[in-house]
Amino acid sequence: MEQQQDRRELDAKAREGETVVPGGTGGKSLDAQERLAEGRSRGGQTRKEQIGSEGYQEMGRKGGLSSAGGPGGERASEEGRPIDESKYRHP
């Protein structure tokens, strides 16, 4: 009974625009946020399987360098940081 009340409270917060589930940003209800979070997690896992663990790590390094000033690959080369794209395993 208490769990249903908790879910109702979380759903009310979600309907007000608050993110109540990590990874559920943009969902307009508790259920929508849960589905978004699950899909995003599954999507990341699928990508990791496609390009391999090392490629996934390199992709994260490259993405971490991206900014409003330009893509991560450009910034990495400007700073002299090597990004080894050969680690990307192509399906």
Curated annotation (Swiss-Prot):
GO terms for cellular component: cytosol. PROSITE patterns: SMALL_HYDR_PLANT_SEED. Residues 1-91 are annotated as: Disordered. Pfam families: LEA_5. InterPro entries: LEA_5, Sm_Hydphi_plant_seed_CS, Small_hydrophilic_seed_prot. It comes from the Eukaryota. One of its GO terms (biological process) is response to abscisic acid. Residues 1-18, 31-51, 75-91 have a biased composition (Basic and acidic residues). Residues 62-73 have a biased composition (Gly residues). Belongs to the small hydrophilic plant seed protein family. This is Em-like protein.
